[in-house]
Amino acid sequence: MYQGRPTAPGGEVLKSDWFRYWRWADGDEKVIELRAEGFAHDVPADAGLVFQTIDLAASLKSSADYTVIQTWMRIRADKAHHFLLFDSVRRRMDGPELIAAVEAGVAKWKPRIVGVESSGFQLAICQMLKKKGIPVREVRPDRDKLSRALAATPAMEAGRVWFPASAPWRHDLEAELLGFPASAHDDQVDCLSMAIGGFVHLPSTFTPAPVNISTSPAHQRAQKFLDIARPFDYGGQPSTIRESDGGVYLEEED
């Protein structure tokens, strides 16, 4: 049962058997421990690509959707990409509070890329965030929510998606995932789908557009130039991040 709605035991689309958990291997929070049956890997906390996915909703009404800001790190282990969820902010916010929350998240986590689902009012917010030097990539879904969630299931079923074991919000997140698509809200599902099933996928015609953000204090750890894609649809060909002297690029995989 999630928010008064019955849910299938173990999940309808996203299964509880697929959930994996990462932990800090030391008190200094410098090494991440990944442990599952047949899999053991230790990862330096700064070893991966940090990015964010955001699902915007600008309303304080009790019936409104939530704004969700998720922070992820993508690493490569055993010749496969793994996605580690670091943080998830989920609350109802109006416009000014929403902008401030995104700025705070960027300042704290210093993501290379911030994916924002953009349509309607979100387009204006994306432009405001870009003007503040935030490395926004607009994401325009070309499929329904269920299809996008299904695109994320292979990585989850393969044990390549990891949640923080000790996060206070973890149980609410899992309840929403297991309740999908019957749950009253699916904002966290949308962000997860974007991160795993769409955010690192680009059309074959993708061309990076360089944006200089070197003067932004929130991005002191970023490259001098960060190449930010034009708006793109979920789908396309799998891509990887390549770093060069000129910035960060997403390239198609063979």
Indicate where each model-derived feature is located.
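Short glycine/threonine-rich catalytic loop with a Thr-x-Gly-x-Asp
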Residues: 184-185
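ATPase catalytic-site recognition across NTP-hydrolyzing enzymes
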Residues: 1-56
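Short, function-defining helix-loop hinge/capping sites that tune catalysis or transport
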Residues: 49, 63, 69, 125, ...
